[in-house]
Amino acid sequence: MPSLPLSQGKPLDVPRTVHQALELHRQGRIADAERLYASVLAVRPDNIDALQMLGDIKLARGELATALRLFAAALQLRPKSPQILSGYGLALNGMGQHGEALAAFDQAIKQKKSFAEAHNNRGGVLVALNRHADALESFERAVAIKPDYAEAQYNRGFALHRLGRNGEALKAMERAIALRPGYAKAHANHGVVLDALGRTADAITSYDRALAIQGDLPDALLNRAAALHALKRYDEALQSLDRLLAGHPNHADGHYMRGRVMVELNRPDDAVACCEQAVALNPEFTRARWTTPLFTLPILYAVQSEIAVRRADYERRLRALRSDIEAGRIPGDMTKGLGWAQPFFLAYQGQCDRDLQTLFGELAVKVMAARYGETELAAPPQPGEPIRVGIVSGFFFQHSVWKIGCKAWVTQLDRERFQVCGYSIGFRRDAETEVARQHCHRFIEGPRSLAEWRDIIAADKPHVLLYPEIGMFHQVAEIAALRLAPVQCSYIGHPQTSGYPTIDCFLSGELIEPADGDAHYSEKLIRLPNIGFHYEPPEIAPATVTREELGLRASATVYWCPQSLFKYLPQHDAVFPRIAREAGDCQFVFIKHSGAAAVTELFQSRLEKAFAAAGLKASDHCVFLAGMELSRFTAASRVCDVMLDSIEWSGGNTTLESLAQDLPVVTVETALMRGRVSGGMLRMMGLPETVAGSVDDYVALAVRMARDAEFRAAIKSRVARDKNRLYRDHASIAALEDFIERAVRGR
């Protein structure tokens, strides 16, 4: 429809023009209405209706400074108008002037207590201020006044979600959708809440509904990609991101999410490029800045020489980041995203990482201290007062970190001497979470912000904080960079020094540490007795699996190789064909990578080359199984003859589970603790015969297991007889108790 002409050469009929503009505005002809409002203000700059309505148009278009000027002029004429005050508040809020915006909405509500929109908009300001409980009160007042107010129902759901009350949030989102079925944002955030409830597949359905309504909704496309990433459907995640970036090429979060997908596809160069693009688009995107060095580290290496190249690139980028931070060249809050930068895959290079971890750890602690300052710590306990022990973990559920160490701390520490508090940072819950809840004096669960966790832990005044792992769960890594207790300790849940000056001690085991182990840690190394932990063997539901089902030959000696593929370094690929050539009819059983198929395919390609170099075919000897639930995994191990430990990063929980099935284990002890855990277990059992001193000895032992049935049977019998020596070792708990007493009480 053509624009309406203005009268030429005649005085403007202001009342008629305002009426005409209002009618056009009501019809949705915004450009024509805007033109008429402007013509009115050109001759009557004090026309209240034109000021207010043109302000609304500018506000909707995002021209916030102009909108603010128009509303301010209108308020000069009508200072108590609730509608104008509300528009003024929205403009202020959009410009980040949250305090002034809150005052404007308070004034609007004072003039009209039943103004549902003002209550809703007030809640929006409180959300921007991270005052979600107060925001919820405002949204609930809006809904009480106007029950069919879909936007307020939606906002109520958002606030509930931010408060961790996701069950209620889901109902609020569903109410908003029932009121307005075409409400795309409500469908999209319905998906966010479902995802938070662990219903990720259902969340994707909600994102798809949102996109069916509004096909280019950026948040829905981004969150859909994140959900697909979580479900390990990486190709579909890329499709969603391609769609997002086609319509919004400057979407920094989209580029960053694409980088995360590239990491899983083992494409580190592409991942780094995506991160760099995200930072170029948003210099305050601190998570992307932290993770750029991290993304240089692949999941799996193609050749040994790649390790040195990637390691050097990681160090170079980390030093550059430190230089930029120290020089003040980076805008934004660098505490945001720190936990996502944990260099998990650095530990899988087979080298001592103390210096690199210290480089990272010192930077992390410095950034956190600048943001949060010092915390008042607990005074030493009085005589007879229990020592307060806090355990910070994202793994208070059935997980190797829980099973090795953490569970025993929760259940076995002497309650007369120690008061145990659990800080469950993670999201997953199961029966083991309930075990933790029942045994802890106090058990606090997330999700919560870093600031909230800091305040909660600081208020509890722990004398000791124990971290079962640092480097696996992002928020744990952030909390560990703060000094919240006089004594703070890490542990072998992630067998790597933290590098954090805030972590005083690393708890390990005397049988798994080399003589020079102290040099591998930035922390003081504490060698607990034996393997360093009290292990309770799990009760596993029985399952039956045959060799035929698994593609294994009845005649073959079958080697169980159940470790994550990224534990297998390329320099040791030749071990498998060496064993095969000497052992004869044998097969190696590997577990496929749980993520992108590209990782498994790369490892298979490496093995094919190694076997071909030995004049053998990998397909004759190597079998790859998909991931399995525990009972089937255990049953699969039972049809094997020998567990072959991975070299330079030995098994922990997998070794314990193999020994529980009476499986002989062949291992080789290497320079670092993480390559010696299985060896420590076997020595604790009195089985040093299958602990090799070199890779050549390892190959010879594996071959002997195939060729000497009597030897293998004898080892199997001894495993069955002596495996109980590994279980329920209270010596490690008693030593931990004594260590804590000395560290806290100074005796």
Predicted regions and their residues:
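Glycosyltransferase donor-sugar binding loop
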Residues: Y423-R428, F588-S605
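Short hydrophobic signal-anchor/transmembrane segments that target glycosyltransferases
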Residues: A408-E416, P570-D585
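Short alpha-helix at the nucleotide-sugar/activated-sugar donor binding site of glycosyltransferases
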Residues: L659-A660, R683
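Short Ser/Thr-rich beta->loop micro-motif in glycosyltransferases that lines
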Residues: E469, D645-G651, E669
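Short hydrophobic beta-strand element within catalytic cores of glycosyltransferases
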Residues: P664-M673
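Short glycine/serine-rich donor-binding loops of glycosyltransferases
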Residues: T654-T655, S678
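Alpha-helical solenoid repeat scaffolds of the TPR/TPR-like class and their adjacent stem/linker regions
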Residues: M1-R553, S605, K609-K617, F624, ...
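Donor-sugar nucleotide-binding helix/loop cap in glycosyltransferases
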Residues: L644, S658
